[in-house]
């Protein structure tokens, strides 16, 4: 009897407590679900059970909708990175770039808001940027400038040797003092003012501090940059500075503030794409040499490292040996490149349009990728895209490979080749080639003509 009274009293206490506006009471911790009538904690309702959205087919599990959204976002980032426009639009870009990369090595790099530290994130991403920059712009040149202790120092000259730039960046590990924007831009200006005007002049400043220590006003430096057509862009690892944004706007550059490590990498990779050239820049023919690689049994010195080597590239103008391509001959200043280098730089002028997504489920038929021959039945992601020019269908992997690495649509290339073959293989009427003579005659559109004349000819088709 006493046990029942105790239970009733406890139940009455719980009922009465729910009437009070107590933040720690069960009324604020528990809430009723109208669907099944069960009580759930509030933190359980906020938690989304993402595993319930995964679909399962006969081949196993397929990715959730979140992964498909991430995939589509990646394709859109490629569009922003490459500046893809419509089929009929063309943007004039400089194929030969001269870029000064300025790194802020002040004491602010020791901050750990980016893991493991700003310096480690800077070192890793800049190394990836240098490799990607020369991969997409093989005939371009790059120089690295560091700023700390209110000074600026050039640690690598303008060249196309990626290994030399990476090693020079790793050797400059001291982080101390304050940066100097003016001194850094003056050093970059002294290097870029002597490069040919047919190549683009750019400065990329990775800024980590919130202050700058400059000897004088920056207005004269900004005017000098504008007179030399030097484009200055900033990537901020901290908050944006007004003076940096003003410099970027007046020199036709950009200014971005990173959100996290991934966004920092994306902002850097956007700079691998050549920017549009200024409208007043005139087209110019550039003299280049295409040397052949020669290997001899007797070593000879190279002009770049002054070491005895068996193989190298001989300059077609002065005959001096160089170790690698692309480079500039140190004797006659001739640009030494190879045909693949020009081909990799040429694709920036003619961008591949963004492929359209194909909803193959509504078509009630299976589609097949012409690149890897994967079918919609066996595909894991079940995402397919069609080229707006040739209307051929590609899977997700082939679509990313075409836009990120290949830069050519296989369907368009195959269609163009077939068109040329059919055009050359069709002839109407009789055609006389390799003939010399005088005569008068009329010819219609089908290739048939009548005329009188004297002459000799060979090759009747």
From Swiss-Prot:
Segments of this protein annotated with the region 13 X 2 tandem repeat of N-[GE]: 434-459
Keyword Isomerase: no
Annotated Gene3D superfamilies: von Willebrand factor, type A domain, Zinc/RING finger domain, C3HC4 (zinc finger)
Stretches assigned to the VWFA domain: 98-275
Biased segments, Gly residues type: 448-461
Source organism superkingdom: Eukaryota
Biased composition (Polar residues): 1-13
Keywords in alphabetical order: DNA damage, DNA repair, Metal-binding, Nucleus, Repeat, Transcription, Transcription regulation, Zinc, Zinc-finger
Low complexity bias spans: 423-447
GO molecular function: zinc ion binding
PANTHER family cross-referenced by the UniProt entry: GENERAL TRANSCRIPTION FACTOR IIH SUBUNIT 2, GENERAL TRANSCRIPTION FACTOR IIH SUBUNIT 2-RELATED
Description of how the protein assembles with itself and partners: Component of the 7-subunit TFIIH core complex composed of XPB/repB, XPD/repD, gtf2h1, gtf2h2, gtf2h3, gtf2h4 and gtf2h5, which is active in NER. The core complex associates with the 3-subunit CDK-activating kinase (CAK) module composed of cycH/cyclin H, cdk7 and mnat1 to form the 10-subunit holoenzyme (holo-TFIIH) active in transcription.
UniProt-recorded name of the protein: General transcription factor IIH subunit 2
Source species of the chain: Dictyostelium discoideum
């Amino acid at each position: 009897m006493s046990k029942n009274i105790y239970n009733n009293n406890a139940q009455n206490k719980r009922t009465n407590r729910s009437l009070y506006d107590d933040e720690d009471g069960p009324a604020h911790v528990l809430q009723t679900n109208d669907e099944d009538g069960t009580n759930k904690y509030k933190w359980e309702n906020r938690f989304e059970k993402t595993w319930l959205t995964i679909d399962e087919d006969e081949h196993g599990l397929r990715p959730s909708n979140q992964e498909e959204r991430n995939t589509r976002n990646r394709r859109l980032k490629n569009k922003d990175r490459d500046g893809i426009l419509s089929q009929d639009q063309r943007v004039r870009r400089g194929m030969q770039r001269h870029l000064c990369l300025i790194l802020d090595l002040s004491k602010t790099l020791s901050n750990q808001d980016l893991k493991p530290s700003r310096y480690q994130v800077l070192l890793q991403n800049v190394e990836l940027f240098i490799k990607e920059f020369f991969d997409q712009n093989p005939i371009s040149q790059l120089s690295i400038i560091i700023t700390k202790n209110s000074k600026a120092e050039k640690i690598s000259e303008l060249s196309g040797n990626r290994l030399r730039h990476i090693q020079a960046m790793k050797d400059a590990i001291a982080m101390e003092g304050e940066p100097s924007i003016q001194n850094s831009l003056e050093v970059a200006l002294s290097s870029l003012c002597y490069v040919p005007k047919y190549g683009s002049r750019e400065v990329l400043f990775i800024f980590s501090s919130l202050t700058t220590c400059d000897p004088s006003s920056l207005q004269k430096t900004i005017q000098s940059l504008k007179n030399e057509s030097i484009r200055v862009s900033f990537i901020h690892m901290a908050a944006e500075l007004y003076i940096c944004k003003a410099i970027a706007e007046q020199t036709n550059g950009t200014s971005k503030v990173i959100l996290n490590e991934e966004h920092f990498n994306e902002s850097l990779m956007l700079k691998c794409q050549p920017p549009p050239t200024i409208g007043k820049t005139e087209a110019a023919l550039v003299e280049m040499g295409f040397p052949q690689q020669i290997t001899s049994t007797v070593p000879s010195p190279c002009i770049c490292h002054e070491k005895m080597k068996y193989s190298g590239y001989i300059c077609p103008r002065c005959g001096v040996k160089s170790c690698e391509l692309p480079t500039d001959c140190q004797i006659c200043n001739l640009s030494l490149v190879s045909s693949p280098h020009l081909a990799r730089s040429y694709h920036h002028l003619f961008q591949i349009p963004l492929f359209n997504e194909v909803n193959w489920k509504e078509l009630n038929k299976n589609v097949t990728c012409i690149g890897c021959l994967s079918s919609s039945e066996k595909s894991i992601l079940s995402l397919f895209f069609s080229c707006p020019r040739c209307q051929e269908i590609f899977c997700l992997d082939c679509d990313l490979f075409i836009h990120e690495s290949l830069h050519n649509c296989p369907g368009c290339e195959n269609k163009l080749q077939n068109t040329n073959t059919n055009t050359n293989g069709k002839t109407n009427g009789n055609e006389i080639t390799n003939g010399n003579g005088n005569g008068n005659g009329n010819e219609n559109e089908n290739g048939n003509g009548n005329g009188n004349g004297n002459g000799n000819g060979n090759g009747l088709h």
